[in-house]
Structures are given as C-alpha cells and as structure tokens.
Design a protein with these regions (language model features):
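Conserved loop->alpha-helix
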Residues: 1-207
Length: 207
C-alpha cells in the first residue's frame, strides 16, 4: 500500500492478492472495512481517495506504507450473503485489549466508545476491519468476539496484538430502530386521539 496526503484527505494505492477482473473505475472496494471508490485500476493494483470524514472515523489516519489490509469487493444484489450486511460506512475505531486462546479459536477483547457499543447485542453482528463477526459479550466500553483459525489466517486479525487499532461498524439495524423510536416519541404528542393513525397523520410524518 502506498500513501499520499491530498487536500486534507489521503490517496491510497493498494495491491490486491486476488484478480480484479470485472472491477471498474467507480466500483466500491472495501479496505479494512471502509467502502472506498476505485478511481484507477491497473492489473491487481487500484487507487482510492479517502475523504477527511473517513480519516476521522478510521485507522487510516495512522496508516503506513506497506501495511497489510483486508479487501473485499462489493456484494452483488442477488448473490449469496455470508455473515451480515456491511455497508462500509464506519462508525469509528476500537483497540485490541487482549487476545486469549479458547480451544481452536482466539477470543479478541476490544475497547470501544459507548457511542459504538450501545448498538451491539450479545450474538449480534459487528464488522471489525471489515470482517463480519459475532459478538460473544458486550459491556459499556468493551466487547468480545471469537475468531476461528481460518479467519485469523485469511485476514489481518492473525497479525493483531494488544494495543492495535481497528475500524468498527455496528449492525445498521440498531441505528435505524433507535431513530425510528425517537421519531415515534416526538410524534406522540401530535398523535390523533385514541390512536387514530389516518391518512392525515401518515402524510404529516412523511409516509
């Protein structure tokens, strides 16, 4: 990976270890969990621009040339879905707090802000550097996931150690539910008598 600062953002040139046939300029490619647009493609190498907003929400602000990253091309609708839907719109970063062996797996403990963990539930999903993982346990400022040998070998998680930073994206469903419930709460005072949800009420609230 090569890096060049550009107008408060960053231009990254990434070499993939897989064939990019079928990828075109303008396509989205997930880099360490961030959805980025390919602006140049040459063989197995592609170039992306990272905006200041993405830099502020990601580990890219501390990226170094030669760093290994996770890559995934965008899902084609109608294709097979393994794991959960990951948008590539990062919520922020976390830190590896510890790693413990557990049979054939490793338990990763991550520290993360409450603004992120509040949307997690036990046995729910979270994307760590773009990797879809199941939340084993979650507290106010930390959470844990189990990583099998294949995942550790095929991704950057196999190289992580305590203190390393990771990109995080929570399951978007929780955020939608929270916003919907907040809107319902604000609308309560304006609700027609006896719960009459009529055409006027729906139109007033954007339906």
């Amino acid at each position: 990976m090569r890096l060049r600062p550009v107008d408060g953002g960053l231009r990254m040139v990434v070499r993939a270890d897989f064939n990019l046939d079928g990828s075109r300029i303008g396509d989205s490619i997930c880099v360490n969990g961030a959805c980025l647009t390919a602006v140049e493609i040459a063989g197995r190498t592609f170039t992306v621009d990272v905006s200041p907003e993405t830099l502020s929400k990601s580990t890219f602000r501390r990226a170094v040339a030669g760093e290994i990253v996770n890559l995934e091309r965008a899902l084609r609708m109608g294709g097979r879905i393994d794991g959960h839907l990951v948008s590539g719109h990062l919520d922020g970063t976390g830190t590896v707090a510890g790693i413990q062996a557990a049979g054939n797996a490793r338990i990763f403990q991550f520290r993360a802000p409450e603004a992120i963990t509040r949307y997690m539930i036990q046995k729910g999903s979270v994307a760590v550097d773009g990797i879809s993982l199941t939340v084993n346990a979650v507290n106010r400022l930390d959470f844990a996931v189990s990583v099998i040998p294949h995942t550790a070998q095929a991704t950057t998680l196999g190289h992580k150690k305590a203190g390393d930073s990771v990109n995080l994206e929570v399951d978007m469903i929780g955020k939608y539910v929270e916003r919907f419930m907040a809107q319902c709460g604000r609308a309560t005072a304006q609700t027609p008598p006896a719960g009459a949800v009529n055409r006027e009420f729906l139109a007033r609230h954007g339906f």
